Design a protein with these regions (language model features):
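Extreme N-terminal, non-catalytic leader segments
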Residues: 1-26, 36-74
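Small-molecule kinase domains that catalyze NTP-dependent phosphoryl transfer to phosphate-bearing small molecules
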Residues: 6-7, 205, 237, 265-317
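Walker A/P-loop
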Residues: 31
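Short, acidic/turn-prone active-site loops that include or flank metal/cofactor-
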Residues: 48-58, 90, 252-258, 308, ...
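P-loop NTPase motor core
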Residues: 57-130
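Short, surface-exposed basic-aromatic patches at helix termini and helix-loop junctions that form
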Residues: 78, 238-248, 506-517
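Zinc-dependent deaminase catalytic domain
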Residues: 104-122, 126, 132-214, 218-219, ...
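Conserved phosphate-donor/acceptor-positioning beta-strand/loop module used by diverse small-molecule
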Residues: 229-231, 240-267
Length: 552
């Protein structure tokens, strides 16, 4: 096939329609990224970036100046296409104000948002109009001259900027509104009896469906490239990934102290507001809640926004949008190549809780070991084990240990989860069994009663992580190198899809790992306690992964 024919195919696939979803914790820079993507590109950007900022990147990749030239040439030939900035929070705002009784409900502090309460009625009228446009007309064919929805959304955005105080109460309320919509659907806010749209069959996709209808309507008004600011629920992200082949998730990352400082200084949050908002962002126990860590780790492209200036963030966005529009425009960086190996390795994991991959690369750039979290050799992964097999096959099943086939554990399994074909997690069930036992002993000795709710919390606190059957991905990568005679790991780099726990961090320190690149941050003190111990000159560099991953 001729190069011109290939270009023609990509023009049709990548130039006519694309969606970028942004995800990241509050203060990481999702809105800043969306503004960059929605603005025109300064003609002098590439020269300015090359003169003042390129050297910082070139220290990490000797090919970056050549990538920059390729990107600049592509933009000169194809031109920069600005994205339509679609604020998901503004759409939630419309849905909320579409229902009069919700506005003055005690569950929300609506009156505290507004600088002038007289603006509420006008806001409600505008929001009702926007909801009607989206719900009634998204399937009808429009002409590009009719830009009623585009203009109404601009009017709404200006209305919010002028009249609304986006403080911590506003953020908390909108986290609550998002949860309500994902749990109960749109029916609490929108009357479907007189709409051409129907209520989504699964409530968790209620917001996704509304955004999809909005995009469909805006496409009929002539818009082609969209940036969604922002997605913070994994099911919503998976909805867009499944529906649109040209959907790309950009994970925007910034270190927590930087994010916190931005919220306190730039957004007027108070110190006591930060932890509750952070907790709501990382609720992994409910399908309808925000779960930033899961969203970030599912990114197609990972960006850093730790800098005080926007130029580096802007370069990253331009770079990956160009790659999105023309796959193969430039080759992967060393970090992208090696992290892709770690990402691929995780699919070998038979763990039913999470899948992690790791790759150790020597100082000369050669792979020394690959690993994934899984059980030791001669053991059967959890994904292939079930309580039915344990209970019914007596002691003849090779997938179970001598302890698991003992009466004490088998009887507990029979009473706790019964006989079924689903895999079970030994660590979780054994921790629960031992936890209940310890609480029963405590109550018997002290005579103190403990409620069932407190008991559940205590069991989680009493869990013992050493009961897990699997070795961690990092351990397996280290051991693979030792097993096959790969030589010293001193001054090597560890690529892992989840940052090391304390146990793996200690092993990395002992082996002399000099750099650790991760995607998903592990929620413990391993970085501060273990990796930043002793002579600071010998601390390994710990960095969040930047670049393209998975299918992007």
């Amino acid at each position: 096939m001729k190069p011109q024919e290939i270009d023609s195919i990509y023009n049709e696939l990548r130039e006519d329609f694309a969606i970028i979803g942004l995800t990241g914790a509050l203060g990481s820079g999702c809105t800043t990224s969306a503004k960059i993507l929605s603005n025109a590109l300064d003609n002098n950007f590439f020269k300015t970036f090359s003169d003042h900022y390129l050297s910082d990147i070139s220290n990490k990749s000797s090919l970056e100046e050549y990538r920059l030239k390729k990107i600049e040439t592509f933009i000169n030939n194809k031109t920069w296409k600005s994205f339509y900035h679609l604020k998901v929070s503004n759409l939630l705002y419309c849905i909320f104000f579409n229902h009069t009784s919700k506005i003055y409900c005690d569950d929300f502090q609506t009156l505290d948002w507004f600088k002038d309460h007289n603006n509420i009625i006008e806001t409600q009228k505008l929001c009702t109009k926007i909801v009607s446009l989206i719900m009634e007309s998204h399937g009808n064919k429009k002409t590009k001259d009719n830009r009623e929805l585009s203009e109404s959304l601009i009017e709404l955005d200006n209305n919010i900027k002028i009249n609304v105080i986006k403080n911590s109460n506003y953020t908390k309320d909108f986290q609550k509104i998002g949860e309500l919509l994902r749990e109960n659907g749109l029916k609490e806010f929108i009357n479907f009896s007189n709409k051409t749209s129907t209520q989504p069959s699964n409530n968790v996709f209620a917001i996704s469906e509304f955004v999809k209808n909005t995009i469909q309507h805006l496409r009929s008004e002539g818009h082609a490239f969209f940036v969604l600011d922002a997605l913070r629920n994994l099911h919503e992200i998976n909805y867009f990934k499944a529906r649109y082949s040209n959907f790309y998730l950009f994970s925007v990352q910034a270190d927590e102290p930087i994010r916190k400082q931005r919220l306190l200084n730039e957004f007027g949050y108070k110190e006591q507001d930060y932890e509750p908002i952070k907790k709501n962002e990382t609720n992994k126990n409910k399908n309808h809640s925000q779960n930033i860590n899961a969203c970030l780790s599912n990114g197609d492209v990972f960006l850093s926004n730790n800098q005080n200036h926007e130029e580096y963030l802007k370069y990253q966005l331009i770079k990956y949008v160009c790659l999105m529009r023309k796959p193969g425009l430039f080759t992967p960086t060393k970090d992208e190549r090696n992290m892709q190996i770690a990402l691929t390795a995780r699919y070998n994991s038979g763990c039913i809780s999470r899948q992690v991959g790791a790759c150790v690369v020597g100082k000369d750039g050669y792979i020394l070991g690959i690993g994934w979290n899984d059980v030791p050799e001669n053991s059967i992964p959890c994904v292939y084990r079930s309580s039915k097999s344990l209970i019914l096959h007596n002691n003849s099943s090779p997938e179970f240990s001598a302890y698991e086939t003992s009466d004490i554990f088998k009887n507990y399994i029979r009473n706790e989860i019964g006989s079924n074909d689903h895999p079970f997690c030994f660590k979780d069930l054994e921790n629960k069994r031992v936890g209940k036992q310890e609480i029963a002993t405590f109550k018997q000795v002290t005579g103190i009663e403990i409620s069932s709710l407190d008991e559940t919390v205590l069991i989680k606190k009493l869990k013992n992580p050493t009961r897990e059957r699997a070795l961690h991905a990092e351990e397996n990568a280290f051991l693979q190198s030792a097993k096959v005679g790969g030589g010293s790991l001193k001054h090597s780099t560890l690529y892992t899809t989840a940052s090391p726990c304390q146990l793996c961090a200690k092993k990395a320190m002992q082996l002399g790992i000099s750099r650790i690149i991760y995607i998903d941050a592990y929620p413990d003190i391993s970085n501060e306690q273990t990796l930043k111990s002793g002579n600071s000159d010998k601390w390994p560099k710990v960095e969040a992964f930047l670049g393209v991953a998975e299918s992007a």
